[in-house]
Regions:
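Short, conserved phosphate-binding/catalytic loop or strand-edge motifs used
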Residues: 3-13
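Second-shell residues forming the walls of enzyme active-site clefts
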Residues: 21-184, 188, 194
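Proteins with a high burden of low-complexity, intrinsically disordered sequence enriched in S/T/G/P/A and R
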Residues: 1-3, 47
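Mid-to-C-terminal alpha-helical segments outside catalytic/metal-binding sites
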Residues: 187-205
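Conserved beta-strand positions that form and line the central face of beta-propeller blades
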Residues: 18
């Protein structure tokens, strides 16, 4: 389910794909979706972490930004993801959306670069895994989207997304090329053996 909040009616994604702009409605509908899917034996993936709907831009075309403060995020999107995790979602989809406030919080210094969540260790590991306690599978949003590679070239982004916390890709651009990027990233040390094994274990689980 799309558990974004439609905070900016100019946003071309959330103004037609969310349960609305009311926090409790989004939580209730998201939990109902997870429950119904579970009853039918279907795994759910909640998206788009860390949350779309603040920016008015489209992450298909660039890396958009969730510009909320940590406190604002905790009270809105953070609350939603806490509830979805508690409700039993098995996967979370990471978005090509940056969140400078939590980058600064975890780094202890001003955020100097816009980094999509799909490439951010701070957002995937420190926020989603450690702070929110999610232990399921993390998947990227579609990697051919422009927002995925706005912070680095694709040869780096492909292995880096796994190294920094995602477990599986959604779509490739070119299967052979992306496989080569992954193997070369492993050989160059961009992707560690420990992280690769962890991702494989989560996929198999």
């Amino acid at each position: 389910p799309v558990v974004d909040l439609d905070q900016n009616y100019h946003n071309p994604i959330t103004n037609v794909r969310t349960f609305g702009d009311d926090l409790q409605t989004v939580i209730d509908m998201g939990k109902a979706y997870i429950k119904a899917a579970e009853e039918e034996g279907v795994a759910t993936s909640v998206k788009h972490f860390p949350g779309d709907g603040v920016d008015e831009r489209d992450q298909h075309l660039l890396t958009s930004v969730n510009s909320l403060s940590c406190e604002e995020w905790d009270a809105t999107y953070g609350k939603i993801y806490e509830e979805m995790i508690e409700a039993g979602t098995l996967t979370v989809m990471a978005a090509h959306i940056a969140m400078p406030a939590y980058e600064e919080y975890f780094d202890g210094k001003p955020c100097e670069k816009i980094i999509p969540a799909t490439l951010s260790k701070n957002l995937m590991i420190h926020l989603l895994r450690e702070k929110l306690g999610f232990n399921g599978l993390i998947t990227t949003d579609a990697t051919p989207m422009v927002g995925f590679c706005s912070a680095s070239d694709r040869a780096t982004a492909v292995p880096l997304s796994i190294e920094n916390g995602c477990d599986v890709f959604l779509f490739n651009r070119n299967m052979e090329e992306d496989y080569r990027f992954m193997t070369e990233g492993y050989e160059k040390g961009i992707l560690s053996e420990a992280r690769l094994k962890e991702a494989v274990k989560r996929i198999l689980a």
